[in-house]
């Protein structure tokens, strides 16, 4: 039976981002109807960590909105990491806090963070069409910094932004040069507050994207993330093919500003596909 890994997300700082990423409702350039808060209370984060670990999650990603890490965010994430690790839950902790330099990432590593997530999102060529406030190159350098700091690298992208297949190949080729431990695969879902006007990918095209990712990243843990519940809806037969085509990790529960599948029902469905849940992160 195929073993899959469950990962969960905690949006520990939400909204009011000054970047203009066209795919993100957390940008202050878009009037998204989302919750906005500076820092989530530590007790709430610990409750989330315990609950999700009990459901079987092995990865727990602490995500902050905004362009980059700063001293305040570093201290906050470090404090959360130490508190979660003190619980001895056996969680693999990931931080996702935007652009970061080597010193900042080493600080997080020493505080108990195991991996850093920073997605390339799309190809270097297509990126200026979806963001003007920072460059693709900045993203790539942050990924390199994570590796230099001795952190596991989690880096992937979004399919369905109106990019071409050539753009998809270019992104995957760049990711392959980084050899990430985990690659999140997201499918863009149109939102009326966002400037990207793109139709939701069909399940068949999404599966083709997964096959392509597996070809370029045969050794990475491919994790299906945002958009799965919309692209595959109730099409169990095609959703099951995700795992035949190379997916071996799943985001369990909600995303940053959108609802995911109900965790218990999602796990039941995954088990019905003949999958088993990993019990340790390796």
UniProtKB/Swiss-Prot annotation:
Query: SUPFAM superfamilies annotated for this entry?
Result: Radical SAM enzymes
From the UniProt record, list the reaction(s) this protein catalyses.
(4R,5S)-dethiobiotin + (sulfur carrier)-SH + 2 reduced [2Fe-2S]-[ferredoxin] + 2 S-adenosyl-L-methionine = (sulfur carrier)-H + biotin + 2 5'-deoxyadenosine + 2 L-methionine + 2 oxidized [2Fe-2S]-[ferredoxin]
- Residues reported in the UniProt entry to bind [2Fe-2S] cluster: 61, 96, 154, 221
What CDD domains is this protein classified in? Radical_SAM
Question: Where does the secretion signal sit in this chain?
Answer: none
Quaternary structure and partners: Homodimer.
Protein family: Belongs to the radical SAM superfamily. Biotin synthase family.
- GO BP of this protein: biotin biosynthetic process
**Protein name (database record):** Biotin synthase
Note how many cofactor molecules are bound and how.
Binds 1 [4Fe-4S] cluster. The cluster is coordinated with 3 cysteines and an exchangeable S-adenosyl-L-methionine. Binds 1 [2Fe-2S] cluster. The cluster is coordinated with 3 cysteines and 1 arginine.
Q: What pathway annotation does it carry?
A: Cofactor biosynthesis; biotin biosynthesis; biotin from 7,8-diaminononanoate: step 2/2
Organism classification: Bacteria, Pseudomonadati, Campylobacterota, Epsilonproteobacteria, Campylobacterales
Q: What does this protein do?
A: Catalyzes the conversion of dethiobiotin (DTB) to biotin by the insertion of a sulfur atom into dethiobiotin via a radical-based mechanism.
PANTHER family linked to this entry: BIOTIN SYNTHASE, BIOTIN SYNTHASE, MITOCHONDRIAL
Q: Which UniProt keywords apply?
A: 2Fe-2S, 4Fe-4S, Biotin biosynthesis, Iron, Iron-sulfur, Metal-binding, S-adenosyl-L-methionine, Transferase
EC numbers listed for it are 2.8.1.6
Q: List the disulfide bonds.
A: none
InterPro entries the UniProt entry points to: Aldolase_TIM, BATS_dom, Biotin_synth/BioAB, Biotin_synthase, Elp3/MiaA/NifB-like_rSAM, rSAM
């Amino acid at each position: 039976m195929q073993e899959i890994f469950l990962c969960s997300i905690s949006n520990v700082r939400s909204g009011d981002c000054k970047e203009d990423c066209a795919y993100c409702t957390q940008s202050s350039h878009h009037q998204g109807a989302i919750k906005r808060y500076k820092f989530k209370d530590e007790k709430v984060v610990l409750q989330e960590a315990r609950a999700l670990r009990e459901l079987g999650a092995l990865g727990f990603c602490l995500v902050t909105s905004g362009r980059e890490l700063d001293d305040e965010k570093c201290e906050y994430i470090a404090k959360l990491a130490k508190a979660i690790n003190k619980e001895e839950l056996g969680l693999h902790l990931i931080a996702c806090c935007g652009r970061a330099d080597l010193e900042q990432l080493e600080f997080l590593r020493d505080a108990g963070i195991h991996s850093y997530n920073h997605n390339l999102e799309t190809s270097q060529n297509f990126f200026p069409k979806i963001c003007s406030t920072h460059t693709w190159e900045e993203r790539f350098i942050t990924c390199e910094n994570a590796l230099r700091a001795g952190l596991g690298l989690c880096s992937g992208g979004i399919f369905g932004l109106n990019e071409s297949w050539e753009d998809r190949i270019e992104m995957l080729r760049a990711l392959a040069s980084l050899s990430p431990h985990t690659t999140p695969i997201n499918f863009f879902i149109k939102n009326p507050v966002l400037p990207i006007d793109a139709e939701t990918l069909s399940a068949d095209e999404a599966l083709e994207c997964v096959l392509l990712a597996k070809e370029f990243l045969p050794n990475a843990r491919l994790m299906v993330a945002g958009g799965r519940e919309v692209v595959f809806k109730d099409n169990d037969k095609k959703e099951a093919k995700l795992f035949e085509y190379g997916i071996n990790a799943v985001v369990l529960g909600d995303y940053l500003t959108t609802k995911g599948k109900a965790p218990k029902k999602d796990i039941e469905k995954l088990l019905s596909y003949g999958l088993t849940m990993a019990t340790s992160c390796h």
